[in-house]
Each structure stands twice: as structure tokens, then as C-alpha cells.
Amino acid sequence: MNPRPSIAFAKFAAPQTAANRKGTVFVLSADDGGLSDAARAYDPGKTLERAFPVAEFTGKFAGVVEILAPEGTSLDRLVAIGAGKAAGLDEYAWLKLGGTIAASLRKATDVAVVLDLVGASIDGKDAANLAAGILLRSYSFDKYKTSKDKDDAKADPKKPVKITIHTADPAGAKKAFADAEAVIDGVLLARDLVNEPANILGPVEFAARAKELETLGVKVEILTEKEMKKLGMGSLLGVAQGSPRGARMAVMQWNGGKPKDGPIAFVGKGVTFDTGGNSMKPASGMEDMKGDMGGAAAVTGLMHALAARKAKANVVGIIGLVENAVDGHAQRPGDIVTSMSGQTIEVLNTDAEGRLVLADALWYCNDRFQPKFMVNLATLTGAIMVALGLHYAGLFSNNDELAERLAAAGQATQERLWRMPLGAEYDKLIDSKNADMKNIGGRYGGAIIAAQFLQRFVKDTPWAHLDIAGTAMGSPSSEINQSWGSGFGVRLLDRLVRDHYES
């Protein structure tokens, strides 16, 4: 992997210092096409501004124009980034501007960003969000490549990019960035986990990665198959029985709130590879099922983020980790298993396994911790992708307040959610003549039926299910993400905790 950029903050340079600057400089221009005085200091010959009309650069958001070796300077490149409407830049806009800068770095190793804009008041949080956008877009997963592609335009991996962001409030920016960087680290951890191949990251290895959070102050317990069997987790263990790689459950606790406060809880599906079991998936595209642990990755990344920024909340993160493989011991269609709740399940499709894992994980979480609410994340159904495409995750909930708060957090972070229905009409579709329930329903409403199944394991606890099958992996590239594994859910849930549940 290319090393992440090194980011520092400083005051605006004096004109003489700016004129003698070397390397690459980025400046911002609003939609009137004008530069601030701080930006003009790097272009005494006005070479860049003269290029605006020729390049048809108007300051439109994320537009880019650059000059190589501008006259009268020692710079290699001078680059203008369009900021659009100066007065309308929100948190996500600053992230995207940072991503645009990262995409334009090329092989630069010494970079200055002049964070000044005519018509806008830019504070420390804005600067921190721009820096966070740079880190998000700069991420790449190429650790297994032994040589660079010939057309790779990125900098030499042995020379990490040094970026200095010049702003009116460098102290405020530095403080805000420490908080933002903690969250970004959680996102990048989630991306790493989703991107890892399944031969490297199985249930045991994933559990070990979760255990590493102890260095941040997270309490981590790893339940083995023997311990889960003793607890009666027949639903989860049934999925795992076809693989020689043992199942695990990681229980993570961050106690940053008041001792008397009950915890909030997040539960993730962690199927480290999903063949479909005896209900085998088609070979085409099966390689993507290394990412079927995107929910567990998001929960692990969230716990990293909360601990790293010392969130003032008591939070539990639980991930059920299995591999759904096929051998002579694998679960068969028609098998009946007993979940930790005591409810029996007729397994009619072994490729509807994520809900079986979550059933025991949710029950265990609720039974042990009595949380204020539970939110589970899972790459659960292809049906949600048919319904919503790749830009929204499905939101199902038994609690309107929790659903509204999640939707608002999704809008604020642009990790967007769309609420889907639940109801008795759907619930009866999973009734079984041979057991308390079956793990699939009819042909229609597959994402809803999966959510109805999960609801049978949460009692009356406020609960939400996020089906992130379309957003956790293989989602469209954006200004802040070019990775196959997106890390979806970390920023969303951090925002939920930050806005509503910190003491």
C-alpha cells in the first residue's frame, strides 16, 4: 500500500515566502472564478487566473485547472480547485473537495493547500474535513502487488506525500482533525477488512484483528465454538459446520460514558466467505463473497473510531464470524437447528445464512447487555440491491425515533438510508410447519422477509437492521472512495452516537 499522506496545518504564508515556494500548491476558487489574496501570493504573474477562461474554468464545484512550472515561481504545479457556491459548503462538500485534491496529487511529494476562499468563512472543522477527504480518497488496497503498474500516477511509495494546509485557524484545525482522523482510521480499517482475501482473513484471523482494539482501551472477548455451543448458539454454529475454519464471536466493549449508563449496541454479520453452502452460489462473481463480512467490518471500524476519539458513551460491538463452506459436514436444506433463544429454525436455503448468524448474535447481545437499542449491519440480501440500487442501504426498524435518527445521520454523512416496511403480512411468510420458523419466505420481498426473521430475535428492544449489501462492497466510486470495500457505516454510526448518545 502507498503510505498515507502526512498532514499538517499552518497559518497563511507571507507573500515573500509564498513566492519562493517549491513543489505543488492547491488553491480554491468559488464559482465567480476569483482567487483570494492568500492564493494570489503563489501566482505573482497571474498565470493561473489568465488560464481560467482558456480552460473554461468557472469555479464550478470539483472543477480543476493547473499550470505546470508557472512563470515567476519555483513551483512544479499550481492547481485551482473549484469550490462552487462559497456560502453553501457543508461537511460532505469539504470531504469531496479534499478527495478532489487527493485525486490531483499525481506524483507530488511536497504539497501546500491554501484554504482561503472569497465569500466564505472557513473554520477549523472545515479544514479538518478537507484533510479527512484527502485521506479517504488516498486509500488504496495494493499490499499484495509486488510491483507498481507502469501507468501508476501515484507518488513513489517510499516518499510519502507531505501536505501542509494553510488556514486562518491552524490550532482549531489540528484539534478538529485529531477527532476526524480517529473516525477516518475506523473507515480505513473497515475497508482493509472487507478487501482482504478470504484465505488471509477467516473467522479466527478476523477475531484477532478485533482483539487488537485492546490497545485503544476496548475490552475484547473472543468466544470459541465450544463456548458458543455451551450457550446454545445452534443457529450460528450450523452455518459454520461445513468449514474447517472455526467460528468465533468477538464481543467488544467501549466504556467511555458514565458507569450507570446502559450501553448502546451494534451487531455485525461476519461471514468471511460465503459459498452459499449446499445451496451453492453460481461460480461467476463468487469471489466477491470475501466481502460478506462488511457488517462486521463496519462494527469493528466503528469501535475503533469511538475508542480512538474517546467517545463519551458506553458501546457494545458484537460480530458473529463464520465461513459458509461445503464439505461432508455442511448444513443441508431441510435441517432444523435450535437458536440461543430456544426458537427452532428450518433451514430451507443454506445461502440465507447471514440471518442465522445474526439471530444468535442479536439474542446474545440483548440477553447479556440489555442495551438501550441494537443496530445490526449486514450484507444480507441481493433483494435490497434490486430495490434500492447501490447508493442507499435499506433501513428496517421497530422504533420510529431510532429510525429517524439513523436516517438523519445518514443524510449528514451521505451514507444514506431508505426506510423499508415491516409487518405481520410479511412475518407470517416465515412460519414453518416443521419448526418455529423457516429461514426464507416466498419469491417476493426478500429483504423485508430477512428483516422480519431478525425481528424475532430482538424482543421489544429498540432495534434497527441495516442491509448494506449494495453499499459495503463494489459500490460506485466517489470523490472520497475508490476502494472496492467502502467502509460504509462507520461514519454514519459514529454520527449517530455523536449526535444523540454521548454524555
Curated annotation (Swiss-Prot):
Main location: cytoplasm
Free-text remark on how the cofactor is bound: Binds 2 manganese ions per subunit.
Cofactor requirements of the protein: Mn(2+)
Gene Ontology MF: a single term: manganese ion binding
Binding positions (Mn(2+) 1): D274, D351, E353
UniProt xrefs under PROSITE patterns: CYTOSOL_AP
Enzyme class: hydrolase
EC annotation from Swiss-Prot or TrEMBL: 3.4.11.1, 3.4.11.10
GO cellular component, one term: cytoplasm
Cell compartments where the protein resides: Cytoplasm
Annotated Mn(2+) 2 binding sites: K269, D274, D292, E353
InterPro entries the record matches: Leucine_aapep/pepB (IPR011356), Macro_dom-like (IPR043472), Peptidase_M17_C (IPR000819), Peptidase_M17_leu_NH2_pept (IPR023042), Peptidase_M17_N (IPR008283)
Superkingdom: Bacteria
Reaction(s) catalysed (UniProt annotation): Release of an N-terminal amino acid, Xaa-|-Yaa-, in which Xaa is preferably Leu, but may be other amino acids including Pro although not Arg or Lys, and Yaa may be Pro. Amino acid amides and methyl esters are also readily hydrolyzed, but rates on arylamides are exceedingly low; Release of an N-terminal amino acid, preferentially leucine, but not glutamic or aspartic acids
Active site annotation, chain numbering: K281, R355
Keyword Metal-binding set for record: yes
GO biological process: proteolysis
Its biological purpose: Presumably involved in the processing and regular turnover of intracellular proteins. Catalyzes the removal of unsubstituted N-terminal amino acids from various peptides.
Family: Belongs to the peptidase M17 family.
PANTHER family in UniProt: CYTOSOL AMINOPEPTIDASE (PTHR11963:SF23), LEUCINE AMINOPEPTIDASE-RELATED (PTHR11963)
Protein name according to UniProt: Probable cytosol aminopeptidase
